């Protein structure tokens, strides 16, 4: 550990914390809250040695304050046993942009509503194009919790740790190893919830359902065993499986049965999955019309109800998961609770709110769009209008323009944060997670986990995200 870097970072917190051996002691929480923004900025934009020290101080200070990355596994299994209520749906939010300010807005909304059952997540594809490795993402979330005075378990999830069908076909071993490397990096960073997505390998051309799902359940089982080997002591990582690729045909009871029977048969003696993602009619990012607006999407809520009941009653899971939901109309969200959906994934709408926000200079938006035309023109379909092309690809500009957004004027970030908080509050109320801090405290016992020294900063190779879901 660099003593010089340590002193530089400690100087930023003005005596609020002290390093005692391998631990961080919080001496003055108020001063820490006042200065944590400077620490996370260094944790994101400093040189590698500075990043490592800043992230370590954030992690250790969070542990000391009782802000602990945790697995939601036990709560979901309690739902499967009928011991936990089914009258709320857990939102899982992908914070592609302004992760720290966005997470602050989440924690403010949660504190206001006494909510505890919510998840921060990021997908394999997003890690690449938003330029946020797992350790950075965890640090931003924990720094936000410190800033907003939040306490308790914090659920951070790897979303769509997904096999690319194209890469798998070319070189299966290489693709499997890439996912395992990402899993290990994520667990080390504090991701104690991981959604495995090998549904891309389902082959519906096969006449037999077991054959259709075989590669999916075999690889999901292999990754589950790997996760169980790598999870820290005292943590049972919540693992999710997926039976229907988002944007493809709707899932059926027969699909679920084929997957679960096969998965349980081959997984071995390890703890299995806690939930299953299914397809019900959505597309990630929505369906973009020629003018760049979104088409109304019809979700088959009956599929969620039927398959969720089957997953709980026959297999003891927490239920089923809905992906690609953030671009649905506001009137749809309460229906997830009515059909007892376990978890719903939300991403694109928050990105849209930030990019389109009136506090963001038009010149910055146009700079992003010009960058897209110069750098991702190959992704434009011949039938795409310019508005469609920009809407569908602008997420690819998030990483290259990350610093420009983080360094917007304070009043701009405040205005964006306030509007995000309103949206999170609305979603949390619709999904009925108000008051869920109590049920989380009942079922989730998160251990203190310390890092003896800063983790090495992984740059992570830029990988092609073609064909990967968000």
What is the predicted function of each stretch?
Residues 159, 239, 276, 323, ...:
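Conserved, mostly hydrophobic/aromatic
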Residues 321-324, 329-330, 334-348:
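Structured mid-domain segments that build the active-site/substrate or prosthetic-cofactor binding neighborhood
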Residues 160-161, 243, 319-328:
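Glycine-rich beta-to-alpha transition loops that act as phosphate-gripper elements at the mouths
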Residues 280-284, 326-329, 350-353:
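Short, catalytically relevant binding-site loops at active-site mouths
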Residues 104-117, 135-139, 143-151, 170-316:
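Alpha/beta enzyme core
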Residues 197-203, 339-358:
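Glycine-rich phosphate-binding active-site loops on the catalytic face of alpha/beta enzymes
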Residues 1-158, 164-167, 171-175, 181, ...:
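Alpha/beta catalytic barrel-like cores
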Residues 167, 288-290, 329-339, 354-365:
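Histidine/acidic-residue-rich catalytic or RNA/ligand-binding cores of hydrolases
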């Amino acid at each position: 550990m660099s003593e010089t870097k340590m002193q530089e970072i400690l100087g930023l917190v003005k005596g609020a914390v002290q390093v005692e051996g391998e631990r961080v002691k919080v001496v003055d929480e108020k001063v820490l809250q006042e200065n944590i923004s400077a620490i996370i900025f260094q944790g994101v934009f400093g040189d590698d040695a500075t990043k490592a020290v800043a992230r370590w101080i954030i992690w250790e200070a969070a542990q000391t304050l009782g802000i602990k990355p945790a697995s939601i596994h036990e709560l979901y299994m309690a739902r499967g046993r009928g011991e936990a209520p089914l009258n709320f749906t857990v939102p899982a939010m992908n914070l592609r942009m302004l992760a720290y300010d966005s997470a602050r807005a989440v924690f403010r909304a949660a504190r206001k509503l006494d909510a505890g059952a919510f998840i921060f997540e990021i997908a394999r594809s997003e890690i690449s194009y938003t330029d946020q490795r797992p350790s950075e993402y965890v640090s931003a979330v924990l720094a936000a919790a410190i800033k907003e005075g939040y306490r308790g378990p914090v659920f951070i999830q790897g979303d769509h740790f997904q096999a690319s069908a194209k890469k798998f076909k070319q070189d299966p071993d290489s693709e499997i190893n890439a996912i395992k490397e990402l899993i290990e990096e994520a667990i080390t960073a504090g991701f104690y919830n991981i959604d495995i997505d090998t549904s891309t390998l389902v082959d519906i051309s096969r006449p037999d359902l077991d054959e259709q799902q075989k590669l999916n359940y075999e690889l999901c089982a292999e990754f589950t065993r790997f996760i169980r080997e790598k999870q820290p002591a005292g943590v049972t990582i919540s693992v999710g499986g997926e039976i229907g690729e988002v944007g493809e045909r709707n899932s059926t009871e027969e699909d679920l049965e084929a997957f679960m029977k096969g998965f349980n048969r081959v997984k071995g003696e390890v703890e299995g999955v806690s939930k299953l993602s299914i397809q019900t009619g959505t597309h990630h990012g929505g369906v973009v019309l020629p003018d760049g607006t979104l088409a109304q999407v019809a979700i088959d809520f009956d599929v969620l109800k039927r398959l969720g009941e089957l997953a709980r009653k026959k297999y003891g899971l927490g239920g089923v998961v809905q992906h690609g939901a953030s671009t649905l109309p506001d009137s749809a969200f309460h229906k997830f609770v009515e059909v007892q959906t376990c978890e719903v994934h939300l991403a694109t709408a928050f990105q849209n709110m930030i990019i389109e926000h009136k506090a963001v200079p038009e010149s910055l938006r146009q700079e992003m769009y010009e960058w897209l035309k110069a750098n991702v023109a190959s992704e434009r379909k011949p039938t795409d209008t310019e508005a469609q092309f920009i809407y569908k690809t602008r997420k690819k500009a998030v990483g290259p323009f990350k610093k420009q957004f983080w360094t917007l004027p304070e009043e701009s970030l405040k205005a964006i944060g306030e509007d995000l908080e309103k949206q999170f509050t609305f979603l949390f109320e619709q999904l009925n997670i108000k008051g869920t801090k109590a049920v989380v405290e009942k079922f989730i016992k998160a251990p203190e986990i310390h890092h003896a020294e800063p983790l090495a900063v992984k740059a992570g190779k830029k990988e092609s995200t073609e064909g990967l879901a968000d």
